[in-house]
Regions:
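C-terminal substrate/ligand-recognition segments
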Residues: 377-387, 392, 417-450, 465-481, ...
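C-terminal structured "cap/appendage" subdomains that terminate the fold
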Residues: 468-521
Length: 521
């Protein structure tokens, strides 16, 4: 399978990167501003006149770049002009189903369900249009007694059927690939599902090299250790295909981060940040785009890996200054918590981490227990490592409560497992503070093994501190340098370029000549 994926990645290089080679030759200028809107080449034919068709194609292009709000506005304008256009309401329904981005808010779901029901009532004017309308209906209907995973799978099956009925429909193939990614298991390290989606997308590539969905979803398909390098052509092309979409400028940094290409990640996210602000100036003056916070988290991560602490500090200050969002999205919740926590933990400023608070106070944290857990984890680790065990236990108790609130929640990513990792990390450092060293090792080994079995959520560039990196730190602290070498090397296999693991590995190697060996890290 890997050979097939490699071959398909080579096809991307031939058909897409070759077309953008002149721009790619000047990396310092890859995100130049464009005077006209550029969202990629999309044509999704429906039964409307020429002007409405152009507007529909634009809205679908925005949808493929996850610019959901602007896409929804476009579909709504079509519906206002032609209230009997069922496909306009299909588009609105699609804008409120986010198969990769995480839990769907109740407001989004209700809005999408109403649009889906309207589309079903109006119907499509062709069998193909009707198939699209029927497919999205499988996600929204029966929500009172069918859980979200089952409805997402029903949508995937419906898109598979559509793809089989209309094999020459490029949009059907692309949306089918996205539906597959929405159901990819987080614990299958063969990535068979993701490779299936990548194969579908690469089959479309020769016919649609400038399609935003092909590049975008290929990045998501290959955003995993061992596969990320195959997505470099797509990453470096996507920002050329749709530079008017902030998410298209940010998305390449997922791959740059996976590969430790920090300078490219910074350039990508600075460009995305500028684009996000331009969008807000036009659509929500005075508000911050939640997508910008997502970009700021990736920027912080990259700055910290390069030791650019002053630049990272400026991001922290900017996060603290946010007073209004265009949407209370999961990306915003994660960034609000992660950015200050990263800044303290990556610098090993344990006292600073212990003093973190859940902020901003105006944000509805009760809707995002998994995000608050980031702050509590940083507090727990920081307090334990600075000698304040009582404070660490308080943070752990809050983590336990948050973990219980997520038990049985099945809507996309399993955050309960991630909280389990975080609880074990805090327990490990509490044990170390109490000189219960074997217990500390057991907890951190357990945390590292569990974290290694999971895939990170796309909302994050990476763990605040990888559990196995923390295990390496503990092993060094206990004088077990040889075991620490193994731990750090394992981290760098999946997260190349991590500053603390590189530094820890260098120190462990210096000490390992005389250090005792042990069982396993």
């Amino acid at each position: 399978m890997k050979r097939i994926v490699c071959t398909l990645a080579a096809l991307w290089a031939v058909f897409l990167v070759g077309r953008t080679a002149p721009a790619l030759a000047h990396e310092d200028h890859v995100h130049e501003a464009v005077p006209v809107e550029k969202l990629g080449s999309v044509h999704f034919p429906i039964s409307v006149g020429p002007e409405a068709q152009r507007n529909f194609d634009r809205a679908v292009a925005l949808l493929h770049s996850f610019e959901y709000e602007e896409a929804q506005r476009g579909f709504r304008e079509i519906a206002d002009q032609d209230p009997k256009c069922g496909m306009a309401f299909w588009g609105i329904a699609m804008c409120n189903y986010h198969p990769i981005w995480g839990p769907t808010t109740q407001a989004d779901f209700d809005r999408g369900r109403l649009a889906s029901e309207t589309a079903a009532r109006l119907g499509g004017k062709t069998d193909r249009e009707q198939s699209y309308i029927a497919a999205i209906a499988t996600y929204y209907k029966d929500a009172d007694h069918v859980d979200a995973p089952a409805r997402r799978m029903a949508y995937e099956k419906a898109m598979e059927s559509l793809h089989q009925r209309f094999p020459d429909d490029l949009e059907g193939t692309i949306f089918y690939a996205l539906s597959i990614l929405g159901n990819a298991p987080t614990t299958d390290k063969t990535y068979a599902v993701q490779k299936k989606a990548a194969a579908l997308l690469n089959s479309v590539l020769p016919k649609a090299p400038d399609h935003p969905g092909v590049a975008h979803y290929l990045i998501h398909s290959l955003d995993y250790p061992g596969l990320a390098e195959l997505a470099l052509p797509a990453a470096r092309a996507y920002s050329k295909i749709a530079p008017s979409a902030p998410h298209a400028l940010h998305m390449p940094s997922h791959i740059f981060t996976r590969l430790g290409l920090w300078d490219e990640s910074i350039r990508s996210n600075l460009a995305a940040q500028r684009a996000a602000r331009a969008v807000m100036t036009k659509t929500h003056p005075g508000s911050t785009y939640f997508e910008e916070l997502h970009e700021m988290d990736y920027l912080t991560y990259a700055y910290l890996q390069l030791g650019r602490y002053g630049d990272a500090r400026r991001i922290v200050d900017a996060i603290h200054a946010v007073s209004q969002l265009n949407q209370e999205a999961p990306q915003a919740a994660f960034a609000f918590a992660a950015v200050p926590a990263r800044y303290a933990l990556e610098r090993h400023q344990w006292g600073e981490a212990a003093r973190l608070t859940v902020a901003p106070a105006w944000f509805p944290w009760d809707k995002f227990a998994w995000a608050e857990a980031l702050t509590q984890t940083a507090r727990g680790i920081g307090a334990a490592r600075s000698g304040n065990v009582a404070e660490s236990r308080m943070a752990l108790a809050r983590l336990d409560t948050l973990h219980q609130s997520l038990a049985g929640v099945k809507d996309g990513y399993d955050w309960a497992d991630q909280l389990d990792v975080q609880r074990r990390e805090v327990k490990g450092w509490i044990a170390r503070a109490g000189r219960r060293d074997e217990e500390a090792l057991t907890e951190l080994r357990s945390a590292a093994d569990l974290e290694d079995s999971l895939d990170k959520n796309p909302v994050t560039p990476g763990a605040m501190l990888p559990a196995r990196e923390q295990l390496g730190d503990l092993l060094l602290d206990l004088g077990r340098a040889r075991d620490a070498v193994t731990a750090y090397e394992e981290v760098l296999k999946s997260s190349p370029g991590r500053r603390n693991s590189i530094r820890g590995l260098a120190k462990a190697k210096r000490l390992s000549a005389t250090g005792p060996s042990s069982s396993r890290p």
